């Protein structure tokens, strides 16, 4: 029997050493490539890029198609057609979030409000509260988790892929300053229609066991992104952003480092593999 598309992509992505459903998004006229990372400011970033690109089209008198849904690709924010050569003059960025608040936000948005059986990792499991949700995903292979629940270092393939900048949701002002430096045409348009105010609900859902489960499931996220593993520190940003694999301390100037000519992906084998994988998808080969 012929394997389904999801299964086939999983097999091929494993062989290539990439994540099967990571999402590279780009704008035709702006120097940004964004690696999607759900529940970590993705709606705000995508909406901002769409707004800026739409304004560019209108200034040039070019007709374009734009979806009001920020998560849907359109002429303003594309998920196909990016060529490796076009990345040499674009900045690769993403944004991360404290694992405690991100894990709870994913549960409140995607599980508590719908039938958990929608997600393969939760199928055949009793999921009546946040702790049971964590127990279910703890039993699942991390790379096969839905990317709302998956560890962020897998979504970003970090530190294998070299990013020009990785920002923190807890410090969105750094994103705003970066966008202003990259192009005066990009303004950070805060948008969070799927927000579940997870930060204010931590004590309502976190048991001692749930805390330990998040510390175990997302141990590498805490480590590589610099987050403290204490629940009381869930709203604290580790710094301004990550540039060149280094966490830039809060208050330290980072724009000069982050806004240099984007060359960090130039000799990055992990990024090359990701681009080849997306090329196969573009060509409808998988």
PLM feature segments, named:
Residues 1-284:
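Membrane-interface amphipathic segments in extracytoplasmic regions
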């Amino acid at each position: 029997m012929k394997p389904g598309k999801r299964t086939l992509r999983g097999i091929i992505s494993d062989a290539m050493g990439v994540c099967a459903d990571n999402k590279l998004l780009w704008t035709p006229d702006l120097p940004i490539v964004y690696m999607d990372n759900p529940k970590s400011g993705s709606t705000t970033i995508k909406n901002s890029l769409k707004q800026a690109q739409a304004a560019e089209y209108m200034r040039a008198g070019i007709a374009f198609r734009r979806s009001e849904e920020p998560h849907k690709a359109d002429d303003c924010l594309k998920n196909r057609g990016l060529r490796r050569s076009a990345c040499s003059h674009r900045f690769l960025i993403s944004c991360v979030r404290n694992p405690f608040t991100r894990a709870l936000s994913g549960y409140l948005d995607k599980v508590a409000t719908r039938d958990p059986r929608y997600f393969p990792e939760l199928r055949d499991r009793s999921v009546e509260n946040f702790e049971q949700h964590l127990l279910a995903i703890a039993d699942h292979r991390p790379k096969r988790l839905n990317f709302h629940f998956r560890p962020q270092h897998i979504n970003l393939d970090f530190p294998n892929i070299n990013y020009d900048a990785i920002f923190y949701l807890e410090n969105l002002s750094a994103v705003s300053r970066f966008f202003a430096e990259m192009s005066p045409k990009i303004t950070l348009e805060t948008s969070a229609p799927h927000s579940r105010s997870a930060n204010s609900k931590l004590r309502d859902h976190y048991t001692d066991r749930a805390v330990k489960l998040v510390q175990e499931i997302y141990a590498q996220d805490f480590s590589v992104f610099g987050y403290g593993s204490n629940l009381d520190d869930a709203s604290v940003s580790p710094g301004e952003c990550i540039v060149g694999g280094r966490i830039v301390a809060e208050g330290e100037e980072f724009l000069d480092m982050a806004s240099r000519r984007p060359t960090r992906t130039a000799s990055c084998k992990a990024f090359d593999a990701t681009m080849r994988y997306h090329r196969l998808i573009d060509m409808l080969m998988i």
